[in-house]
């Protein structure tokens, strides 16, 4: 999966 950090890191 792809991890996003907007605003917290969520994978």
Curated annotation (Swiss-Prot):
Location(s), subcellular: Secreted
Keyword Transferase attached: no
Job of this protein: Antibacterial activity against B.subtilis, E.coli, S.aureus, M.luteus and P.putida. Antifungal activity against S.cerevisiae.
Spans through the membrane: none
Entry keyword Lyase: no
Name of the protein: Tigerinin-4
Disulfide bonds: 3-11
Protein origin, superkingdom: Eukaryota
GO terms for cellular component: extracellular region
Predominant cellular place of this UniProt entry's protein: secreted
Organism: Hoplobatrachus tigerinus (Indian bull frog)
Tissue expression per record: Expressed by the skin glands.
Annotated GO biological process: defense response to bacterium; defense response to fungus; killing of cells of another organism
Keywords: Amphibian defense peptide, Antibiotic, Antimicrobial, Disulfide bond, Fungicide, Secreted
């Amino acid at each position: 999966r792809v991890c996003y950090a907007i605003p917290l890191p969520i994978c």
